[in-house]
């Protein structure tokens, strides 16, 4: 339990993590496009967001070379969301390994937002960057929650996994802010985990059906193009 914290949603995990690790002026690399709150959370924690433009030819995924180019002596962390909101793309094991190598070499923390981990289609596999070896695991703050997988957005339940010293800092900050998720929410989360199986499979099936239907309609509009969504529920 020294490496786990439970809180009021993945958003809370991200915010508390940034408040824990950042000193004023520290930089955080954020690939673009990104979830709207990333940059604002960094600013609220006293940090400086460094937004990296990505290329549609690479499905808007940041490369190791782009990450290297964004690193300065003030870089503290990189925020990595895969599966990606808002593009629906998925980083491969090879792409993640390349980013992990850069992070470890530069001793940069990776804040891995994996909230859409179950929403992966067409036989693709979601790989967690923290699973790629002990070195990158020790440099990763993994964030997840119940809002997407279990359709529990309003319940506000999330968690983070990280080295014990980071989690200890997060617990101190959380103790003076939200304290903890409500007891009712925690019991609901236990039930969700225990009954995951077919319920989650059905949720994924429904979203996959919607995804295919949307793509079929978009394919009929010659003036529009899109990046093929391997994951999430965005195009």
Per-region residue spans from a language model:
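A short helix-loop-beta submotif of the ANL/AMP-binding
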Residues: 44-50
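Conserved glycine-rich beta-strand-loop-beta hairpin in the small C-terminal domain of fold type I
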Residues: 190, 206-215, 226-235
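Structural motif of enzymes handling amino- and sulfur-group chemistry
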Residues: 181-203, 233
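Helix C-cap/helix->beta junction micro-motif
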Residues: 45, 105-106, 136
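Active-site phosphate-binding strand-loop segment of PLP-dependent enzymes
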Residues: 55-124
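Phosphate-binding glycine-rich loop
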Residues: 1-27
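Conserved PLP-anchoring active-site segment centered on the Schiff-base-forming lysine
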Residues: 20-42
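Active-site PLP attachment segment
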Residues: 132-169
């Amino acid at each position: 339990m020294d490496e786990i914290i439970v809180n009021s949603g993945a958003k809370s995990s991200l915010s508390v993590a940034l408040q824990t690790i950042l000193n004023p002026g520290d930089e955080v690399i954020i690939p673009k496009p990104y979830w709207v709150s990333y940059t604002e959370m960094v600013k609220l924690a006293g940090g400086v967001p460094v937004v990296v433009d990505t290329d549609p030819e690479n499905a808007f995924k940041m490369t190791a070379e782009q990450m290297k180019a964004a690193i300065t002596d003030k870089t503290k962390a990189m925020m990595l969301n895969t599966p990606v909101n808002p593009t629906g793309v998925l980083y491969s094991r090879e792409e993640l390994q390349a980013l992990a190598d850069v992070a470890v070499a530069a001793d940069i923390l990776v804040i891995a937002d994996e909230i859409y981990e179950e929403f992966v289609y067409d036989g693709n596999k979601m790989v967690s960057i923290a699973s790629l070896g002990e070195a990158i695991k020790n440099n990763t703050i993994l964030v997840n929650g119940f809002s997407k997988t279990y359709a529990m957005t309003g319940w506000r339940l999330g968690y983070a996994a990280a080295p014990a010293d980071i989690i200890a800092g997060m617990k101190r900050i959380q103790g003076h802010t939200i304290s903890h998720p409500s007891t009712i929410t925690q019991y609901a989360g236990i039930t969700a985990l225990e009954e995951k199986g077919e319920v989650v499979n059905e949720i994924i099936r429904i979203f996959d059906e919607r995804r295919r239907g949307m793509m079929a309609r978009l394919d009929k509009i010659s003036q529009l193009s899109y990046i093929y969504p391997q994951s999430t529920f965005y195009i």
